Amino acid sequence: TTVMEGGKRPGHFNGVCQVVSRLFYIVRPSNAYFGEKDWQQIAVIKRLVDYIGMDIQIVECPIVRDKSGLAMSSRNSLLKKNEREIASNIYRILKESIELTDKLNVSDLHDKVVNEINSIEGLKVEYFEIVDGNTLLPVHQWNDSPYVVGCITVYCGQTPIRLIDHIKYKG
């Protein structure tokens, strides 16, 4: 895929698919568990399983969050204490945006989320895409898909650290 993570990290999902398909061929699992934090990866792996024709149930595991709402990630250890506090705004803003889906169209909600996060010193949105949760194709209206997900990557801090998260709007 060449959208979101695939566009920012060329070849990344080719590598993911190569490693995961080899693992699946060796292990032959009936179920495989993947964390929802990287929503795009789940969608890619579901398509991979269909493509290679294996009967594997892909189980989506909810994001584990710290008490502030920050999605758990090994990258969080690179954040300073004040940067962790700043980063917790990502999920807060995403969560608040759910309440706006009946008031704002997709484009306006997108802009509001990006502008609100970018207005916080120490945060910079790399991308925020509102997509069909299965196909990863952009949605332009809330009724374009029964399954709508917002996928975001934000740089946090002086270093800066790249953080990913997502929010389910429908489905």
Can you name each region flagged by the protein language model?
Residues T1-V3, G69, I161:
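Active-site loop ensemble at the mouth of alpha/beta enzyme cores that anchors a bound cofactor
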Residues V3-M4, M72, L79, L136:
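Short clusters of hydrophobic/aromatic residues that line enzyme substrate/ligand-binding pockets
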Residues F24-V27, Y51-G53, A71, W142, ...:
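Solvent-exposed alpha-helices and their adjacent loops that cap or buttress functional pockets
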Residues G7, E36-K37, V154:
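Fold-independent oxyanion-binding glycine-rich loops
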Residues S21, K37, G133:
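Flexible loop residues that form catalytic
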Residues D38-E126, V131, G171:
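Glycine-rich, Lys/Arg-enriched anion-binding loops that position phosphate/diphosphate groups
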Residues K112-G171:
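Phosphate/ribose-recognition catalytic cores of enzymes acting on nucleotide-derived substrates
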Residues T1-Y33:
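Divalent-metal (Mg2+/Mn2+/Ca2+)-assisted nucleotide/phosphate chemistry catalytic cores
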